[in-house]
Amino acid sequence: MKVAVLGAAGGIGQALALLLKTQLPAGSKLSLYDIAPVTPGVAVDLSHIPTAVEIKGFAGEDPTPALVDADVVLISAGVARKPGMDRSDLFNINAGIVRNLMEKVAATCPKALVGIITNPVNTTVAIAAEVMKKAGVYDKNRLFGVTTLDVIRSETFIAELKGLNVADVNINVIGGHSGVTILPLLSQVKGVSFTDEEVAALTKRIQNAGTEVVEAKAGGGSATLSMGQAACRFGLSLVRGLQGEANVVECAYVDGGSEHAQFFAQPILLGKNGVEKVMPYGEVSAFEANARDAMLDTLNADIKLGVEFVK
């Protein structure tokens, strides 16, 4: 099993690489790429950790050597949010980065499962899909927008609010991966009830949690460590699916035939071909139905921006 991380010298990429080095199955290969010259050194640093995961780092303009024979590709390359920016401000820089990297993925490892972390995910996943279509290698079951950070934040905040063991909290987060498009289905959380006020406040906190971190870091960065953990969880789930493990389910932003938008985050069953099945996200409350319907204009505009960027 070979996993490639593109953008591996950044804040998310280094955290993700560390977690993968310690948690990938024995015998796996981990390949790190970044344009920054420090990247081979990041790999050397991580290579001193005693786990049975072989690691190599590549720098420079061309990610191709890192991508050869990759089974899973996780893309975190791009610029991070600064105070006052929202995820869409990142579009101008990150759109081109994702397009260029995906052209190399299409040419080198078109059958790999690709997880897009680079924001704005609502748009960058659409860009990735269009690049793969242009190359004639698009498989909607092998492309994912990584929305796991919204899930782990929801789990954490619910457990804190209700005094629960966080390991017992399971929640679906649907829609997209920015602002109002992030919709935690709080009504479905088992064994707990929320007041209307709690639902409104918790939903807003989950939607704005990225900004909470950006402001707390006072210009010194964005959510890199929690995102690294979220990306590792999702990447390991992709690997477990590829290895034939049963019942591996994660929420992700996929081209899954949703009635709501071309790309939509909801629970998916993972397997040897990536998406084995898009799962129904279940019954929702009136609050959630309204929030879902209200987000669709924003979500569809984000998707359209990505499609048009490639055309």
From Swiss-Prot:
Q: Where is the active site?
A: 177
Q: Which residues form a coiled coil?
A: none
Q: Which domain of life is it from?
A: Bacteria
- Per UniProt, which keywords does this protein have? NAD, Oxidoreductase, Tricarboxylic acid cycle
Q: Which GO terms describe its biological process?
A: malate metabolic process; tricarboxylic acid cycle
Leading EC class: oxidoreductase
Instruction: Tell whether Oxidoreductase is among the UniProt keywords.
Output: yes
**What's a single GO MF annotation on this record?**
L-malate dehydrogenase (NAD+) activity
Report whether Chloroplast shows up as a keyword of the record.
no
Please give the family membership noted in the entry. Belongs to the LDH/MDH superfamily. MDH type 1 family.
Known partners and oligomeric status: Homodimer.
Q: What is this protein called?
A: Malate dehydrogenase
Q: Which organism is it from?
A: Shewanella denitrificans (strain OS217 / ATCC BAA-1090 / DSM 15013)
Encoding gene, per UniProt annotation: mdh
